């Protein structure tokens, strides 16, 4: 016998579960945040707060009111960290791929912000200024690379000497079926561009936050500037 009340109850229950899941995801995307670190990179003392995390040969210095980084020979990437260590963080930075980068290197060069970095592993939001491409990726300690999300022809990605505003958030979910998974959101110029949920978040034990410039191929001579670095944490309120 067909029972309308039972069907209505099942529909209501399904809607409730779906609504709760959506609420959990939107809570991650629109979570209240508190800024705990800000560095405009305007002075020598401020730039000195950025500590090299990886890269065999990396040169650094000032460029106006920014930190300039130059990748050396036999080096694919130069990464620097902020003083902030933690699991659930958001990092933002304004980054430019400089036109002083050799032309053969420019096309494959990327700018990035990194979270949960350590022992060669990390989450990374990478932007390719000349390709208009954005990647959200995960690197493990053994060097293996997993692409969590990729977007091409992103209008918000700017070219040589132009400011790219990168922002990466990595928060572990604390309730629901995805409890313990890491929710990752990548923003370019304030717009959400890439996102993913990583159910293997425990594979990353690093806690460093930072930024980098490099290339998967030849990165020698790649130059980038970094300023307006901000690190935020979830609000407890």
Question: For each predicted feature, which ranges?
Answer:
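Short carbohydrate-recognition loop motifs
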Residues: 55-76
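Extracellular carbohydrate-recognition regions
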Residues: 31-52
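Secretory/extracellular carbohydrate-interaction modules
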Residues: 70-140
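Flexible glycan-contacting loops in extracellular carbohydrate-active proteins
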Residues: 195-227
């Amino acid at each position: 016998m067909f029972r309308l009340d039972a069907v209505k109850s099942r529909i209501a229950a399904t809607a409730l579960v779906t609504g709760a899941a959506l609420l959990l995801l939107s809570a991650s995307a629109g979570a209240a945040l508190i800024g705990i670190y800000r560095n405009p990179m305007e002075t020598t003392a401020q730039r000195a707060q950025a500590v090299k995390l990886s890269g065999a040969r990396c040169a650094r210095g000032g460029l106006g009111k920014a930190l300039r980084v130059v990748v050396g020979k036999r080096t694919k990437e130069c990464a620097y960290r902020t003083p902030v260590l933690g699991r659930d963080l958001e990092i933002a930075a304004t980054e430019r791929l400089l036109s002083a980068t050799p032309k053969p290197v420019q096309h494959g060069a990327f700018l990035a912000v990194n979270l949960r970095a350590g022992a060669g592993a990390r989450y990374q939001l990478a932007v390719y200024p000349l390709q208009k491409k954005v990647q959200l990726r995960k690197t493990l300690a053994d060097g293996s690379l997993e692409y969590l999300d990729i977007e091409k022809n992103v209008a918000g990605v700017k070219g040589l000497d132009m400011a790219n505003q990168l922002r990466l958030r990595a928060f572990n979910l604390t309730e629901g079926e995805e409890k313990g998974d890491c929710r990752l959101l990548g923003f370019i110029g304030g717009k959400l561009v890439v996102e993913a949920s990583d159910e293997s978040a425990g594979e990353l034990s690093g806690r460093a936050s930072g930024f980098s410039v490099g290339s998967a191929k030849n990165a020698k001579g790649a130059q980038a500037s970094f300023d307006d670095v901000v690190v935020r944490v979830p609000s407890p309120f």
